[in-house]
Amino acid sequence: MLKIVGVTDLDGVVKEETIKYIETTHSLYGKFYSKDLFVGMPFCFVYDDYSGQMLRSSTICHWDYVEKDKLYIIETMNSIYYIKELEE
């Protein structure tokens, strides 16, 4: 299972307002999802700063997996999502 553990901008600055919004108004933050949602698919769910909504995004630019940390790093057009793989 996967858990979103952080969101930053492309310079690595934590997006506090984004995280706060997602934590308080959308069920995606801190919830668990199967890997299929993120890996091997051309989209993920991202917070859009302009509309203030979670959107299904097709703008993944790059993703990587850090095996020792069991951490997926997903880069979109304007954010980087850190998604931790947890034992079920």
Protein language model regions, located:
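N-terminal non-globular leader segments, chiefly Sec-dependent signal peptides
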Residues: 1-67
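Short, compact, well-ordered microdomains
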Residues: 57-88
